[in-house]
UniProtKB/Swiss-Prot annotation:
B5 domain sequence ranges: 269-344
GO biological process terms, semicolon-separated: phenylalanyl-tRNA aminoacylation
Record-linked Gene3D superfamilies: 3.30.56.10, Bira Bifunctional Protein, Domain 2 (3.30.930.10), Phenylalanyl-trna Synthetase, Chain B, domain 3 (3.50.40.10)
Cofactor(s) of this protein: Mg(2+)
Family named by the database record: Belongs to the phenylalanyl-tRNA synthetase beta subunit family. Type 2 subfamily.
GO MF annotation terms: ATP binding; magnesium ion binding; phenylalanine-tRNA ligase activity; RNA binding
Protein location: Cytoplasm
Subunit structure: Tetramer of two alpha and two beta subunits.
UniProt EC number: 6.1.1.20
InterPro entries per the UniProt record, alphabetical: aa-tRNA-synth_II/BPL/LPL, B3/B4_tRNA-bd, DNA-bd_dom_put_sf, Phe-tRNA-ligase_IIc_bsu, Phe-tRNA-synth_IIc_bsu_arc_euk, Phe-tRNA_synthase-like_B3/B4, Phe_tRNA_ligase_beta2_arc, PheRS_beta_core
Protein name: Phenylalanine--tRNA ligase beta subunit
Length: 543
């Protein structure tokens, strides 16, 4: 969750006495919590970073309630300000973008700017590892700026007056101690410098005193560096939106040394076009909506929209980094209309429901495992890629919110090992199982996986439980084909075969694999593909 707060009287002075009423009304549309007394506190879900400051939030509120539609124009390139990117940065923090914002003195919005910068560092930037933002007073930097590498022996003065070499700053400044791990331990460091080689900032750590901003700054230069192009792209448009919310004029400098593909990806993200089908909108909403009403709702939510048939042309602002497809746009139409204004309809079903065959199979497998003395558990379908070094699922999450949930699992037993590790305080033996989904070779499969953690757990332990389980479902005897199974001891693992079909795997977990979960107790396991075994034995099951 993301929290912003400010004294209520200050906000009323900036935005008017109706600010609390407007924010409360808008909260029922977007979905965030508000507390207010002497201080106004708002707690957001992490999916709308464009709202994480009072200026940007109030901009969207005015668009929604007052129709103050922003006529967005492409960012004009300012050839008077030139940025040169050196090749040396490509091995450290390769991605770069920049913008210029010019207007009246930042004044009372200074703290909001700094807070928004830090919120983006924590959320979009993943604590500065993927992206970091530097904000400078352009009137102090000159019009020629360089993104380059510098010697760790070069001296600089930080924004708060600490002076020393780059190496000393990294090791002793509070920001260096916190973020120095993001730079190589030796060699040169990346830096933003002026034309004379003076350091303006040391991404992703600290800005210099030379280009320090204050309440009187009118002309800003914003640099965005990172290790992830999407994060840099998102931050560019979010920072542009912050300044445009304060009526600043936004331009981009002339940048030399970057691949044109990267700059085009960042530029094209603003007002990218999506074309939701009218039929899809009606299907999701459950009722017909004419073109004029649809366009009205889209404009209230900050889009530029043009009528059309069978599709509507929707231009998505760059700061709406949460919009990934037509479902997100239709969700915004629903928010604008209000779910309470959707007519309720009775659903008529022509027959009584009954369990799917596979659900009957799962129930039978569940009852059998409980009868064998196992306890059922449920773990996440998303797993960390670090669990699955031999990953065969073929489905990875793009831009995961956490590296702990970066792939859709292709095997279940590593998740069960993690669960055992989190419950080491409980007495042994621990016998648990899960019936769940996984992806193998891009196809979804349903599997039963179980682990036995005990001081005497070994390959034969898992084998006896596996035979007891399969005896309930097939008259054929399973055969174990010796094979090295991921995470298992070679010679104590294999594939489970019935007839000509491989239906699963079995093994005793290798001590080195157990150490990754901080487990000292022996563990054995088996994992069976329910789709394979039960389709082949439907007659024997009697379901």
């Amino acid at each position: 969750m993301v929290v912003i707060r400010a004294p209520l009287k200050e906000l009323e002075g900036r935005y008017g006495r109706e600010i609390v009423d407007l924010i409360l009304r808008y909260s029922s549309i977007i979905g965030y919590s508000v507390d207010h007394d002497e201080e106004l506190k708002i707690e957001f879900n992490p999916d709308r970073p464009d709202l994480f400051s009072f200026p940007t939030l109030m901009k969207q509120i005015k668009i929604f309630f007052y129709g103050e539609v922003e006529i967005r124009k492409p960012q004009i390139r300012d050839d008077a300000v030139k940025v040169t990117v050196s090749k040396g940065v490509r091995d450290i923090r390769p991605y770069f973008s920049a913008l210029i914002a010019e207007g009246s003195s930042i004044g009372v919005h200074f703290d909001e700017l700094i807070n928004y910068q830090e919120i983006l560092h924590a959320s979009i930037g993943k604590d500065r590892s993927k992206m970091a933002i530097g904000i400078h007073d352009l009137e102090k930097t000159g019009d020629s700026i360089h993104y380059t590498t510098v010697s760790r022996n070069q001296r600089m003065q930080t924004y708060d007056g600490m002076e020393g070499t780059v190496d000393w700053i990294i090791k002793n400044h509070e920001k260096g101690i916190a973020y120095g791990r993001l730079l190589p331990g030796t060699g040169r460091s990346v830096a933003i410098t002026d034309n004379e080689g003076n350091i303006l900032s040391l991404p992703p750590i600290v800005n210099s005193y030379r280009s320090r901003i204050d309440e009187g700054t009118k002309k800003f230069f914003v640099d965005i560096t990172g290790t992830d192009l999407n994060s840099v792209k998102f931050a560019h448009h979010l920072m542009s939106n912050f300044f445009s919310s304060l009526k600043y004029r936004i331009r981009t400098p002339s940048i030399d040394g970057l691949p044109s593909r990267e700059t085009e990806i960042i530029r094209a993200f603003d007002f990218r076009i999506m074309r939701p089908a009218r039929r899809s909108i009606e299907r999701y909403l459950g009722e017909k909506m004419d073109s004029e009403e649809t366009i009205t709702h889209l404009r209230r939510m900050g889009y530029v929209a043009e009528p059309g048939y069978p599709e509507i042309a929707v231009y998505v602002p760059g700061y709406r980094v949460d919009v990934m497809g037509e479902a997100d746009i239709i969700e915004d139409i629903l928010k604008s209309k209000g779910i309470e204004n959707i007519e309720e309809k009775q659903i008529f079903i022509g027959k009584f429901g009954e369990p799917l065959f596979m659900n009957k199979v799962k129930d039978l497998a569940r009852d059998t495992m409980i009868g064998l003395g196992f306890q059922e558990v449920m773990t996440f379908v998303l797993s960390p890629a670090s669990y699955l070094q031999e990953y065969t699922g073929g489905v990875r999450i793009q831009n995961p919110k956490s590296e702990d949930y970066s792939v859709i699992r292709d095997k279940i037993y590593p998740d069960l090992l993690d669960l055992i590790a989190r419950n080491k305080k409980h007495s042994l033996p621990q016998r648990i199982f899960e019936i769940g989904d996984k992806i193998v070779g891009g196809k979804q499969r349903t599997a039963l996986s179980c682990v036995i953690a005990d001081t005497r757990s070994e390959f034969s332990t898992a084998k006896s439980y596996m035979q007891g389980f399969l005896a309930r479902f097939t008259s054929e005897n399973p055969v174990i084909v010796p094979q090295m199974i991921y995470g298992s001891i070679d010679g104590r693992s294999g594939s489970i075969k019935i007839g000509e079909k491989i239906i699963g795997v079995i093994g005793e977990i290798h001590p080195a694999f157990l150490e990754r979960f901080s487990l000292a107790v022996p563990v054995s396991f088996f994992e069976i593909d329910l789709d394979e075994i039960f389709i082949a034995n439907m007659d024997h099951l009697g379901l």
